[in-house]
């Protein structure tokens, strides 16, 4: 016991000796926090890295993590992040807290405590990693004081960044049919990543000259029913599969429930989608994801087809082992890996996101910075808008490269109509439905109508 107390005293003394450093404090030492800490340290070794809750619950499991943490010259406290006094620090220097534990409830409880403890301190940031609705509501309603609070939904962040960086290929690989190009995307697995991608593709693929068809598979027999509960209007007959109204979102979304990737019925069904140009495999398990992705590559290769295939692989070592994998003939298996720790938990993605910077600039056209960070609705909507604007530019939409006041009336009309189509799909993917009045708690909105039914004032809001 005495040795443990002395160890804690020496650890805290080390913290005090770094009084003038920027401090990056993690609630836990785990694979995610270590990946982000490695990225921070690589950019600037003078930064002080602090891990909490590092006592050896299982020495064999934690030994490797602790050894890696030591290489960052980090400080490791055994106590919970809320019990260590980090206030004894230069007030001009930033303190950044990362609530990144595996227990979502604990992350939220720690966030509430830290907000109360440090709300009067300048230069203080809290990043809470959570996908739950509870944390979203807390972020919007709690007293933050002087603290800049950010919720990181790592599932949404991965899907949005993937579309921002690589999504243009969906348009490049679209198949010409008659006077348009057809985008055919297949999602295998409807867990968090699969659902997020389905919702995102519904608005992302809205583009003049293109038609989008989205197919998804899941082993659960009620997968379609569950998804329809999340996004009722996205799947209803009035909007799903309707390509006639150029002022409304246009897409076809089909969900195949009760299909196991290990069954022959799955093979037959997915191969009936002849013109698949994009496939995402997200089954919640690295090994199964890799196995299924390679299986699909083999099945489509037999048909002489070579769609873009991506799969989610969490483990960095597995990613490095398979990213350039070939068969015995030297043929590349050509499966793209997303979602690995190294690229998902990095400074560029979490702290210095270029997408966030552009989204904030966009939001400031009609709101202040505080409302961007404080309200998830504003944050997500602006991020989605930035992503789609990039695609409009890459697809060379007439007038998109000009300021609004320099566009012709025809260019303004076309771009406004397209932006409204995207917005309609985005809002329905967020779970909104039409109502004569707007009520965000009920997730209903009066502007969820075809473009021509908008007031002239509301049409101007669609300037992109």
Predicted regions and their residues:
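Mixed-charge, polar/low-complexity N-terminal
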Residues: 4-7, 433-434, 439-440
């Amino acid at each position: 016991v005495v040795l443990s107390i002395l160890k804690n005293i020496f650890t805290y003394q080390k913290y005090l000796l770094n009084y003038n450093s920027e401090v990056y404090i993690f609630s836990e030492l785990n694979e995610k926090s270590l990946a982000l800490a490695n990225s921070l340290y690589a950019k600037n070794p003078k930064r002080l890295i602090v891990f909490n809750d590092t006592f050896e619950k299982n020495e064999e499991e934690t030994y490797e993590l602790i050894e890696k943490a030591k290489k960052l010259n980090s400080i490791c406290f055994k106590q919970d992040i809320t019990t260590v006094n980090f206030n004894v620090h230069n007030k001009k220097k930033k303190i950044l807290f990362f609530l990144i534990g595996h227990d979502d409830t604990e992350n939220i409880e720690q966030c509430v405590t830290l907000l109360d403890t440090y709300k009067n301190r300048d230069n203080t940031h809290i990043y809470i990693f959570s996908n739950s609705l509870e944390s979203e509501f807390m972020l919007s309603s709690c007293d933050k004081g002087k603290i800049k609070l950010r919720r990181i939904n790592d599932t949404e962040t991965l899907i949005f960044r993937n579309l921002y960086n690589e999504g243009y290929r969906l348009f490049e690989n679209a198949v010409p049919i008659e006077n348009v190009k057809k985008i055919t995307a297949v999602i295998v697995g409807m867990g968090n990543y699969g659902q997020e991608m389905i919702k995102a593709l519904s608005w992302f693929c809205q583009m003049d000259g293109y038609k989008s068809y989205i197919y998804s598979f899941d082993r659960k027999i009620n997968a379609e029913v569950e998804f329809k509960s999340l996004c009722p209007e996205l799947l209803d007959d009035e909007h799903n599969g309707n390509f006639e109204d150029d002022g409304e979102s246009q897409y076809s979304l089909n969900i195949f429930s009760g299909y196991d990737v290990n069954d022959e019925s799955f093979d037959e069904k997915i191969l009936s989608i002849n013109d698949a140009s994009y496939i995402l495999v997200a089954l919640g398990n690295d090994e199964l994801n890799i196995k299924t992705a390679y299986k699909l590559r083999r099945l489509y290769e037999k048909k002489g087809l070579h769609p873009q295939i991506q799969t989610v692989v969490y483990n960095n070592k597995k990613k490095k082992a398979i990213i350039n994998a070939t068969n015995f003939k030297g043929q590349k298996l050509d499966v793209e890996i997303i979602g690995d720790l190294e690229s998902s938990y990095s400074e560029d993605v979490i702290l210095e996101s270029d997408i966030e910077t552009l989204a904030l600039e966009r939001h400031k056209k009609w709101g202040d910075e505080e409302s961007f960070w404080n309200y998830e609705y504003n944050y997500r909507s602006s991020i989605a808008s930035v992503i789609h604007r990039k695609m409009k530019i890459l697809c060379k939409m007439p007038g998109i490269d000009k300021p609004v006041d320099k566009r012709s009336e025809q260019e303004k009309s076309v771009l406004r109509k397209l932006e409204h189509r995207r917005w309609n799909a985005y809002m329905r993917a967020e779970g909104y439905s039409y109502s004569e009045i707007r009520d965000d708690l009920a997730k209903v909105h009066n502007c969820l109508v075809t473009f021509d039914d908008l007031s002239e004032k509301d049409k101007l809001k669609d300037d992109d």
